[in-house]
Design a protein with these regions (language model features):
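Glycine/proline-centered hinge or cleavage motifs at structural transition points of membrane proteins
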Residues: 123-125, 137
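Peri-membrane helix termini and adjoining interfacial loops of integral membrane proteins
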Residues: 62-74, 166-176, 217-225
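Transmembrane alpha-helical segments of polytopic membrane transport and secretion proteins
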Residues: 128, 210-234
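Short amphipathic alpha-helical coupling elements at transmembrane boundaries
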Residues: 39, 69, 73, 114-122, ...
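Short coil/turn motifs that cap or connect alpha-helices
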Residues: 33, 125-126
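Glycine-rich helix-loop "coupling/hinge" segments at transmembrane-helix boundaries
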Residues: 159-186
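Membrane-water interface segments at the C-terminal ends of transmembrane alpha-helices
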Residues: 1-110, 138-159, 163-165, 192-212, ...
Length: 234
């Protein structure tokens, strides 16, 4: 269970960081339309309990899904649901926690000095070069902070691993705590306390490591609030 928690936490946090940071860059730096509704849609998973998210995706990708049936790719009735797997747990954890990364990165983008980006564009740098040479290095502390939030949130998530992991025999520490509590066996409270302590130690160690990395990558470049870049998407 400890390995499964670490694996799902690390991998889902990486995926959540990629998704959340990409959405923050697209919404914060381009001229994409309807930014307000897009931000709401990105943040929507945070407003939905994890177990409800899992149930929704199970129905959306199941044999009775109207969309998949219309496309002719719905799983056969009686077959194993594709989300009942290690990959399904990691994917939904990433989707659930990507908004956390989005909020952190978007806030960091709004605090970056616009002058550096404007100077690079005036000097003839392409949008891709500005992104890789200026924006991403300045965002490194925010990316690490977003990753830490996603990892700790995934480590303590119960709803998604319970609904998707138990059928696949993929047990994480929160699920193991629930199973121990439901058993009402001798020494149940002791077992639960030990497991909870392990989770706390893992979370503290992970956050401490990322804090140290942040200190080495920290920048003090901030600027007054100004309109963000609006890189044309064509």
């Amino acid at each position: 269970a400890l390995w499964n928690s670490l694996e799902s936490g690390v991998l889902s946090a990486i995926l959540a960081t990629i998704i959340g940071a990409t959405l923050a860059l697209v919404i914060g730096l381009t001229d994409v339309r309807l930014k307000g509704p897009l931000v709401f849609l990105v943040l929507l998973p945070m407003m939905i309990p994890p177990h409800v998210t899992a149930i929704s995706w199970i129905q959306a990708l199941g044999p009775s899904s109207p969309l998949l049936r219309s496309l002719g790719i719905a799983p056969e009735i009686g077959s194993t649901h594709p989300l009942y797997s290690r990959e399904g747990v990691i994917l939904l954890l990433a989707l659930q926690h990507a908004p956390l990364v989005f909020l952190v990165v978007r806030a960091a983008l709004r605090a970056q000095p616009r002058e550096l980006m404007d100077a690079a564009r005036i000097a003839g740098a392409s949008a891709g070069r500005v992104l890789t040479r200026i924006i991403l290095p300045l965002l490194l502390p925010a990316l690490l902070a977003g990753y830490a939030l996603a990892f700790v949130s995934a480590l303590g998530n119960f709803g998604i691993p319970a609904l998707l992991g138990i059928p696949a025999r993929y047990t994480t520490l929160p699920v193991l705590i629930w199973q121990r509590m439901a058993s009402f066996g001798v020494g149940m409270l002791t077992n639960v306390s030990v497991i909870a302590m392990i989770m706390a130690v893992v979370a503290v160690v992970a956050v401490t490591i990322l804090y140290v990395l942040q200190r080495y990558g920290r920048t003090a470049l901030t600027g007054p609030p100004r309109p963000p870049l609006a890189i044309s998407l064509g």
